[in-house]
Amino acid sequence: MLKTDIFTPSRFVGEGTVTLRGVKVPYHTVSEDNVFYDDEGKPIASIFSYSYFRSDVAAEDVKSRPVIFGFNGGPGTSSMMVHVGFLGPKRVKYGEVDHDGLPLPPYESCDNEHCLLDIADLVLVDPVGTGFGRLLDESKKDMFYGIEPDAEAFLTFVQAWLARYNRWESPKYLVGESYGCTRASTVAGMGSLSGSDRAYSVTFDGLVMIGNTVTVGKHFGDKSPIYSAVLAFPTLAAVNWYHNHPSNQTVEEFVAEAKGFADTEYLLALYRGNSLEEETREHIIERVMYYTGVSREYLERRALVLEDVEYRSQVIRQKGRYVSRLDGRITRPLYGPLLDEHKWGAHDDPAEGKYNPFFQSVLCGEVFPMLGIKTDRNFVNSHSLWSSWNNDIKGRNTSESLSAAMRRTPTMRTFFVNGWYDICTQIGILYYTLDHSDLPKDRVFVKGYESGHMAYLGEENIKAVSNDIYAFIMGKNPTK
């Protein structure tokens, strides 16, 4: 990775006010490096954090005030999306928008009237190698780049933060997005463990998982033990509902009906394969075409097996458009014959190409000055670490880590937030995970939103997601 700076630990302070639920809330901020050292005292890496503290809280009430640690995924992604997407007191402004409902340049920020700072202090986290966080010694990357090393570094940071600001007694929450759900479940499981090589003794009151990556496989990229086509079916049906309007039902009703078909008739048809009677096969083809919008030719060529990557070029093929992996509502033109689809892949996603410029413009151009951040250090929004990432978690999976944390902490609750149009982390995989794990159902909440991978995008969604997380932090059922 190219560098434009020499690392020097930094700390910046700022202050501001925001009106939340009719009350003017003053706050102060600390943005700082959290440096890791080797045995000789040499800095080897840093996590960068942005802390927001409500300023008018009585000293005796600070310890009982919740702390929310928010982060994104990747691995290799900064906290930018959750920071200016919905958690921070400044957010992206949806003023003049394009046909997908996303802002047009020039990009602007506005006060986030849905921020949770009135009820909790906020800590946005750039893990090692992301945002302003740095890996300073490449030979030490194995200490940070992997499911368990990443969680260990995160827990070490949390311990230091709690000690620095005397917040050990505060209720603690994790808000993770995408791979951040893997991080959150691993951190919660590891933090509650005793008798290990290192007992961190950090437990959490609640986890919010946005764009779920907690699975019963070793990691999210594993093939599921049943046909992935069945797990993808609810999301593909939602995308078809949005673009092709096959039914007057709501998206929730249409998806529920589609899931019922996929879990029964479609699953059995895939299992039987070529032994299907012709009449039954014809019925399955008609139903799959209706629910997902694909063509007969596609299904016959694929032996009835849907595949979500190819699906993105099929669902609105008649319009010459391709739908996004991150948000199936957002489209781009299909590639012409001279362009190689496999060469560009996820790097040419129509949603991500729109998200990143306006989020980074607002964060770097407006939020950082408000936080008092003045630095030549390059802000690394995202870079892929998959090739360097160690996915071994000693034979366990992420749902087992989360189950263990909830078993050891009987008051801990988990709230799963998923967009109906998220083809990247499909809600069907979440349903399957919950049906095949030991998670306590009375403390687990699931809600779908009319959005994509970043479920909070858009004026209606940021309000809905923020209000539901607010209810969750207040101890209520966020799905009611």
Regions found by a protein language model. Name each.
Residues 167-179:
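Alpha/beta-hydrolase fold nucleophile elbow
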Residues 72, 175, 208-211:
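Alpha/beta-hydrolase-fold catalytic nucleophile elbow
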Residues 90-93, 188, 192-293:
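A catalytic-pocket lid/entrance helix-loop region that shapes and gates access to the active site
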Residues 117, 127, 144-162:
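Alpha/beta-hydrolase active-site loop
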Residues 41-143:
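N-terminal cap/lid subdomain of alpha/beta-hydrolase-fold enzymes
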Residues 210, 215-224, 228, 294-480:
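C-terminal subdomain of alpha/beta-hydrolase-fold enzymes, centered on the catalytic histidine
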Residues 176-189:
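Glycine-rich nucleophile elbow surrounding the catalytic serine of serine-hydrolase chemistry
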